[in-house]
């Protein structure tokens, strides 16, 4: 697919826009002022594949904590600010690589200018974030409800405020929990601006519902070439957000690397604990950077044929199974040896 080329923006040592790879974001759910807990979670997320992390900054203590957090992590840190412009300034003074604000709830123009002046002085990007839930009353009335058009107008109004203050180091995010409204909003704003866009479906839900809604919404948006950073917002462990985001990007051909696991849905011919085996295989391959496909099949009758499009695979039988490589059965072995055999092949892949 052809991606839209947006304005290039530097966030710490990462670059978004300008045709650069789409980066994965998440958000910590620790108390930011708890430096040890926050650093530990950021490190876990980094290892899982997170490129940029956002931290809530609801207090001055949290803003000041960013300085120590920054010393101990390897990825850019974004400060999430609401209402108090002084927290935005403090976050930047204590090392935030980017701030996320909604100028509409920061206060007067003087307060917005105070934030922009510090960002300009330090060349720190500002993410202008607008959610459907915070849409201004006059725009709700103008468009007869909460609409994609209203969300886009709100976001661009905020952008123009900052541009009029002489600053354009900006990223835009517009979010709604209504998937189709969100898709339409991103289509509209992408046609009206060249700023990089952070995309996501807000308040998408728990692991199952959130993944489904995010996959549909992000898939529709990204497939049009729209988006420079993404977040899969889930109610749960943020590690799951990274797993889902990586899979969405790989499925759309927007990211290489990382093993894709495919498995059959089970049927009456299944002769092995396929669900358990597939989960163990997923856990096994998570740490490999290989750009290959691994198949996990439930029977030795159809398994080899169905796994022929995979680079590597296993198929289970009654107490035994097959190791399959490039569509060919290479070895028959006891069931308990399947996982070790698969690991050996991964460890020696390409030799």
Predicted regions and their residues:
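N-terminal amphipathic alpha-helix/helix-capping segment at the start of soluble metabolic enzymes
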Residues: 1-27, 120, 283
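Active-site mouth loops of central-metabolism enzymes
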Residues: 19-37, 56, 75-83, 139-152, ...
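Conserved, mostly hydrophobic/aromatic
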Residues: 24, 80, 128, 172, ...
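Glycine-rich, proline-tolerant flexible connector loops at the mouths of alpha/beta enzymes
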Residues: 29, 34-35, 46-69, 100-108, ...
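Alpha-helix-loop-beta-strand connector modules within alpha/beta enzyme cores
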Residues: 60-81, 114-126, 186-197, 281-283
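Glycine-enriched alpha-helix->loop->beta-strand junction motifs that scaffold or abut catalytic
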Residues: 72-75, 93-99, 120-122, 190-196, ...
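Hydrophobic or amphipathic alpha-helical targeting/insertion segments
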Residues: 86-127
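Catalytic alpha/beta core domains of metabolic enzymes, predominantly
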Residues: 131, 139-286
